[in-house]
């Protein structure tokens, strides 16, 4: 087995890149686009799938930390290739109060645009992006699929946005 087959994490979009706009469903009757949040920071949390233990813990942590994200006026969007109905059941079961977006059809299109799609598995990487108010990638992180990346990196990136905006 080669190292490439053991660790095939994606190379996310570079810092300074304009974040690709997208429109994905959050419910059967509502779609969310990145551009609707222009003027405020956005956190994109790509995750492999609803119901897995690590994804469940990661999303529960973000629900707990949501008030901290909101102090920076940041919007949190969870994204996986699961369908809307799976997301709705998962959010209800886990008491999640932020949008979970279905990158379902065409499967992984947004994850591919952000260079975090795992084609062999048909899921996205466990990847995080912080996008500034102008729609520019300011921070990204790809975690091993079995590792919860936590929220510290996100909070540091949001703090840095605030410092950049103040100077």
Regions found by a protein language model. Name each.
Residues 1-167:
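Chalcogenol-based redox active-site neighborhoods
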